[in-house]
Amino acid sequence: MELLKEQIREVARVEKGNVLKVDSFLNHQLDIPLLNEIGKELKKRFQGEKVDKILTAEVSGIAIAAIAAQYFNVPVVFAKKTQSKNLDQDTYEGEVYSYTKGQAYKIRVSKRYLHEKENILIIDDFLANGEALQGLREIVVQANANLVGAGIVIEKGFQGGGKRLRAENMRIESLAIIDEMNESTLVFRDDKADLKADPKAS
């Protein structure tokens, strides 16, 4: 998606540890016009597929999923990372390992909101090692629902999660795939051009 790639080139920052900072438009401050275009593009990528619900994980996936859901005209269900009193005790659970935190945690969805044979589309902001996507898939499997696929805004192709999950026959549509990155360069899979970061953005 060219508009998304241009935004990444112009304002994203790459920090140590393969951290891509897109908090100015995607996961802290939100660029709503851009998110609308992302929603339209995800709808186009899954055109013709029957989707009953969109599933994502809190927190960063919620805004993207909610805006995309307008174009699919379906509800959004988000997996919660904490066990709280206002979450039903009867839940589906997936396990996610966080490489940044160095620990595993559970994500949960009430059984009220995912049902057998429903067609579920997963939407999330990032795909790196694939742990979050795998945890969300576990929840879909437990619900005996049908996984339509996953719509991802940014995939770090060099971290291998997308390759592994595609090899397991999961359909993944990533709007921007980064195959190489460092503090001065980003290389997108579909153009393989060295894209020098704007020094003003750092």
From Swiss-Prot:
Pathway annotation from the record: Purine metabolism; XMP biosynthesis via salvage pathway; XMP from xanthine: step 1/1
Membership in a protein family: Belongs to the purine/pyrimidine phosphoribosyltransferase family. Xpt subfamily.
Chain residues that bind xanthine: 20, 27, 156
Organism in which the protein naturally occurs: Alkaliphilus metalliredigens (strain QYMF)
Catalytic function, reaction form: XMP + diphosphate = xanthine + 5-phospho-alpha-D-ribose 1-diphosphate
Its biological purpose: Converts the preformed base xanthine, a product of nucleic acid breakdown, to xanthosine 5'-monophosphate (XMP), so it can be reused for RNA or DNA synthesis.
Gene name of the record: xpt
Subunit details: Homodimer.
Protein name: Xanthine phosphoribosyltransferase
